[in-house]
Curated annotation (Swiss-Prot):
NCBIfam families: argC
Coiled-coil region: none
The protein, known as: N-acetyl-gamma-glutamyl-phosphate reductase
Originating gene: argC
Alphabetical list of Gene3D superfamilies matching this protein: Dihydrodipicolinate Reductase, domain 2, NAD(P)-binding Rossmann-like Domain
GO molecular function: N-acetyl-gamma-glutamyl-phosphate reductase activity; NAD binding; NADP+ binding
Organism: Thioalkalivibrio sulfidiphilus (strain HL-EbGR7)
Active site residues according to the UniProt entry: 149
Broad class of the protein's primary localization: cytoplasm
Function: Catalyzes the NADPH-dependent reduction of N-acetyl-5-glutamyl phosphate to yield N-acetyl-L-glutamate 5-semialdehyde.
GO annotation, biological process: L-arginine biosynthetic process
Catalytic reaction equation(s): N-acetyl-L-glutamate 5-semialdehyde + phosphate + NADP(+) = N-acetyl-L-glutamyl 5-phosphate + NADPH + H(+)
Length: 343
């Protein structure tokens, strides 16, 4: 049984990790840390865990965490910078759900996150944990950078078009919408019920922190950095991301449905829906699945790709567990085969 540590387990991605690991057939949470809640039982803070664990939060002690096989960081930016190096030196593998190691250029990371990069010496060994493009590198990785939620939905939607060289990469558009849990569990006026409910708005149009990550990923696939207009929106719901993606086709003869079905045929967590489909966020709620539909309206020169994920699962904690499974030689789907709850 894999012994897992979780640093920062009081946020939404942290408790989602707990939910997934407590039901996992090959792993278990062994150390769960929180500076502000040390000594408190997990199930006292999260009653949904009652009957599943007797663990209590502890202080983030590197010595205790180093006894784990793998440590997940579900923390604000900068925390993994400070702790990952020591854990790696002690032989513990690290899976970071924050953005600390996603961007390979330390100076670029600093510009977008407004602070110096705290561990640039670790960037070369960090593997970007999107299994659909990096599966061969993940098993041997010591440090995994789990992709962000928007980058996951957007990248999975665009990848087949870019790999095939079918579109004008200078003019891609990603119109993405997220539920409020994407902002985290901290108190914010804009996330209050009276502010977010019955409301819909764009934000970060001038530049969102996920933009350089998306550009890096799509650039790796396309062989050159694309031109991308990325506009995120806030939806009045708790979970879910819907990304509507647009690209101008260079080749009008390719069967886009067949392209997507063939590209993702062997992917356990990407579901290409039948022609004419419009995937719904509720169909992936609580699951590690990405559902995709591809369209070519009126037979024109524009490809429209619709991509939905649960931002807390495939967009965060589920993808982290998927990476853990690959790192430790477990079935990739272990602990991740749940079905979305409807309605």
């Amino acid at each position: 049984m894999i012994r897992a540590g979780i640093v920062g387990a009081t946020g939404y991605t942290g408790v989602e990790l707990l939910r997934l690991l407590l039901a996992h057939p090959g792993a278990e949470p062994a150390v769960v840390t929180s500076r502000g809640n040390a000594g408190e039982r997990l199930d006292a803070m999260f009653p949904n865990l009652r009957g599943h664990t007797d663990l209590a939060f502890t202080e983030p002690d590197p010595g205790l965490l180093a006894e784990c096989d793998v440590v997940f960081f579900a923390t604000p930016h900068g925390v993994a910078h400070a702790m990952a190096g020591e854990l790696l030196s002690r032989g513990t593998r690290v899976i970071d759900l924050s953005a600390d190691f996603r961007i390979r250029d330390a100076a670029l990371w600093s510009r977008w996150y407004g602070q110096p990069h705290g561990a640039p010496e670790l960037l070369d060994q960090a593997v970007y944990g999107l299994p659909e493009i990096n599966r061969k590198r993940i098993p041997d990785a010591r440090l995994i950078a789990v992709p962000g939620c928007y980058p996951t939905a957007v990248s999975l939607g665009f990848i087949p078009l870019l790999e095939a060289g079918l579109v004008d990469t200078a003019h891609l558009v990603a119109d993405a919408k997220s539920g409020v849990s994407g902002a985290g569990r901290k108190a914010q006026v804009g996330m209050l019920l009276c502010e977010a409910s019955e409301n819909f708005k764009a934000y970060g149009v001038a530049g969102h922190r996920h933009l350089p990550e998306i550009l890096q990923t799509l650039g790796d696939v396309a062989g050159q950095t694309p031109g991308l207009t990325f506009v995120p929106h806030l939806l009045p719901m708790i979970r879910g991301i819907e990304a509507s993606l647009y690209a101008v086709l260079k080749d009008m003869d390719t069967d886009l449905q067949a392209l997507y079905e063939q590209r993702y045929a062997a992917e356990p967590f990407v579901d290409v829906m039948p022609p004419g489909s419009h995937p719904e966020t509720r169909s992936v709620r609580g699951t590690n699945r990405c559902r995709i539909a591809v369209h070519r309206p009126q037979g024109g020169d524009t490809a429209v790709v619709l991509s939905v994920i649960d931002n807390l699962v495939k967009g965060a904690s589920g993808q982290a567990v998927q990476n853990m499974n690959l790192m430790f030689g477990l079935p990739e789907t272990a602990g991740l085969d749940g079905i979305a709850v409807l309605p």
